[in-house]
Amino acid sequence: MLKDLNITKSTIFYILAPSNKFTGGPTLLHQLGFSLKKNFNYTVRMFYYGVSIDNPIHQNYKKYNLPVAIKIEDNPNNILISGEISQHLNLCINLKNIQKIMWWLSVDFFYISQKKLLIKKNLARRFLNYLNKRIIKKISEKIYLKIERLFEIKDLSKMLDSFNFKCHLCQSYYAYEHLKKNKIKNVYMLSDYLDDSFFSNKKYLGLKRKNIILYNPKKGVEITKLIINKLSNYEFKKIENFTPEEIIHLMKTSKIYIDFGEHPGKDRIPREAAYLGACIITGKKGSASNNIDISIPSIYKFDDYRINFHRLESLIDSIFKNFSYHTKNFSGYRNKIRNE
């Protein structure tokens, strides 16, 4: 990766992130900034966009102590790190000189954000046509043709070429495989890591586990609802409105975490749950479809579209009764998470 870049003592790394937002993607971007600063002694600046510009740093990211840039110096000595969503790409397209890197934190959200952009474009076009003013129609046509060339993804490689990225980094093997399949050049793996709080949890030692199944209410909503209704004799608990410390406690005292979401990248919560000792059961969408991103035995993965509820119920019963046996089956996955 570094061979594709021109890095000097005066190089500034700019990292794009939404202002005052605490979710998986922004967490990874702040962790990257912290790693570049701490491990390589690079000059790093966070560039925030969005509505909370006056107070852009979420309180959970203040610990990284990363300086904020008000403006990006667009010169070939500097480097811009962008995520894959359209908000980031909109900022990238106007910067012509800076060295640009795209970090694929997901595959699915890239396409979802592009579709949303196209919907907005089409609505705007209809509105301008409705006005029926020739001069506006001429201007709008030029603008929309340019946008269409950039964002209609008939050829991913050609579309990305228009942004002039020096290289592409992939947080998951799922993303890496997708880019290689689409003949994208200069593609490299760059995983993230779990927060230190998940590795230093000695005060939770000795806690007894309960027959509880955890789930993320924002992931795989329809399938999860179906599972909860079909298997109503079990206790399900959603991970919602908890502090990070409370989540750790929950994962250390529950036996199972299920995730039948889209897995657009190498999701954080399944790794957290597995590392803290829970057994995880997933579907086979996105990054869960391969044995690299979620490297767990196949018996713990189910076809999202044809769930065998009898097998799922038998597996849950077995985990509850023989937890010490099942949790050992995740030791390889835990070691991998520890070494990320």
Residue ranges, per PLM feature:
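Short, polar loop motifs at secondary-structure junctions
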Residues: 49-52, 82-89, 107, 171-177, ...
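Short loop/helix-cap segments at secondary-structure boundaries that form the rim of catalytic
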Residues: 54-58, 73-74, 88-97, 113, ...
